[in-house]
Amino acid sequence: YLKIKDLTDRNNIEIYDKFDWEKVWKENPYLKKNDIKWFLGWLIEDDKKNIVGHIGSLPTQYYYNSIPYNGAVMSCWIVDEKYRHYSMELMRRNIAQKNIDFSIVTSANSKTESALTAFDWRKIPVKKYNEKLHIILNLKKIIDSYLKKKNINTYGLINNIIFYLSYIIFFKRINYWKKFKIKKHVIVYNKFNRKFDNFWNKLKKFNKETFMFNRSSEWINWHLSHQFETNKAIIVAEEQNDEIIGYSICLLKNVDK
């Protein structure tokens, strides 16, 4: 882990600490239930046994027509600039592994996208898969964080002027969400439980022709384990007759930089 951490630090990539990193593998539902040989990833070492390249492979599971399909999520694909000509060999090893039905990448940037396209990978067929919606709760803090991130040094008075101008210009958009009144029975959960499993069983039958990630409580609690344990995620669920009929996972982000 420490050598991989050195590699990610050199390339300005953040990863989990050692405990959470190991937990991702140890608590994976597929690896816990199946006694199979699974490669956690592949490495490139230099002459001094330093790790100069890495690609991880995480087991995942999706459903289609009520049939489970086991796949591998490519993660943490990083290679030092001097050894980037070996990058494709890591990719080749990743997609050639056995015991999987498909491979998927969920966090590709523009550079990764170009490399994947060369291997005939296809984008997820969802038009708005890379769009995000934000609810701004503290405009002043966002403005201050943006100026710090851009290394723009301003005085408090100027920041306040920017804040008030922005608030006036974007008043309707910033306050649009406030007009909605909740009349339904909504409950906030900190983790998935059996109620969500009942909802998932109905969902996969109703949408059986959609390729969907296994949304059982076991899989999602694993997938969001770090966020739940650090209080960075909540589940807002709507219920009728003590049954969940819909929910939304909210990831909390507080940027101070």
Regions found by a protein language model. Name each.
Residues 1-77, 184-257:
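A conserved beta-strand-loop-helix scaffold within acyl/acetyltransferase catalytic domains
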Residues 50-57, 97-110, 127-131, 154-169:
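A broadly tuned preference for mixed-charge, low-complexity surface segments
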Residues 63-144, 251-257:
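Acyl-donor binding region in acyl/amide transferases
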Residues 93-97, 171, 223-226:
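A generic secondary-structure signal
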Residues 122-210:
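Acyltransferase donor/substrate-recognition loop-hinge adjacent to the catalytic core
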